[in-house]
Amino acid sequence: MTALALFDLLKPNYALATQVEFTDPEIVAEYITYPSPNGHGEVRGYLVKPAKMSGKTPAVVVVHENRGLNPYIEDVARRVAKAGYIALAPDGLSSVGGYPGNDDKGRELQQQVDPTN
């Protein structure tokens, strides 16, 4: 897969909705937490792996826009994993409570994120 093909997977397009279900047998998806690198609490992330991995597997960090780890970004991570990559989608809103379930509220929360954390 080329970098250009990966960029096509990452373009936001809410009209497409869910393309790869959480329960797809070709992937293993889970929510994880890990410590903030600067010691400011935990970061929530969505980790998705191909169900059948052997040896070293390339990985992609799926970075959301200003709305948080919304369902579209989760679907992008699942598509990346289905293409054979490990995908990690961290929630950049973790320090302010995480994705609120609404894109407009997510944009508002993005303004409250302390960039030094």
UniProtKB/Swiss-Prot annotation:
This is Putative hydrolase fragment YghX. Disulfide bonds: none annotated. InterPro entries: AB_hydrolase_fold, Dienelactn_hydro, Dienelactone_hydrolase-like. Residues 91-117 are annotated as: Disordered. One of its GO terms (molecular function) is hydrolase activity. SUPFAM superfamilies: alpha/beta-Hydrolases. It comes from the Bacteria. It holds the Pfam family DLH.
